[in-house]
Amino acid sequence: MRLTEERIPNNSKILYSIIIIIKKEIISIKGMVKGVSIKFRSYSETIPRLLELINLGKEIKKHSKIVLKPYLSPIEGEKSLSTSAAFVEQVLRFCLRNKNPVSEIFIAEGVDGEDTMEMFSKLGYTKLAERYSVGLIDLNNTEVERTEKYDFIKFHEIMYPKILKEGFVISLPPLALGEEVAFIGSLSNMLGAFPARHYKGFFSSTKSKIRKWPMKYAVHDILKCKLPDFAIVDSSEKGVILAGLPREVDKQAAKLLGFEWNQVDYLKLIESTFLEKKIKEGKEAIPNVIAQ
């Protein structure tokens, strides 16, 4: 395959741009801590190609636990605003091919207001896990550790799933408008990390205790426990798949839905409080995956 690359220098430490033209298909990569979009053709063709391009396989070999975090929601009528199992399958297949032989892969979610294991079954994840011999984890009932942070905005402490703290977490949301947040993205997807066992109300099956304040604060504080390490957004209905570091991926996702990222309250809050600090300190997750 012939590749043509055009490099446009800007700031040698942080920013550069690469335009890669592959068979007339343009993929843009912007910056060392940015993201990638690729034209969608099919899950089976686009996902492996994208993940090979950004060299994700090299990164996941470093980790003993890989956690795929889809977004699952209750089924209303015949539809569910959930991550497609077919989309997750292609990410899973890539991880299985590229992981360290002793590494484990899990699919984890904590559905709000429904039994997670039943949702796994209804949406095809149980069969997927059986087919590839990987574990399903209900984050609503998994082992947690008490996390206290001085820079939580609203929560005094959060009971956070240990599997997410210990694993390399790949957030896998569908791109869609949300009811309580502007849209479902790789960062707001992590609301599923609040275990219902600790956050549901006495007379409710939903995680009502995270709704004492506007949801942007719950998103912010759960991300203070841990950012997802990587994000792949199913924006196939918009004609592309997005992948990269969560902050940038969600900014690009916002544009696809017609928003400026600083119009999205949770993104604006996150940007202003801690992600800039992480970038300056070089601590944002896998800053060199896209650059390699």
Protein language model regions, located:
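Extended, low-polarity segments enriched in aliphatic/aromatic residues
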Residues: 22-79, 86-292
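N-terminal amphipathic/basic-hydrophobic helices that include classical n-h-c signal peptides
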Residues: 1-24
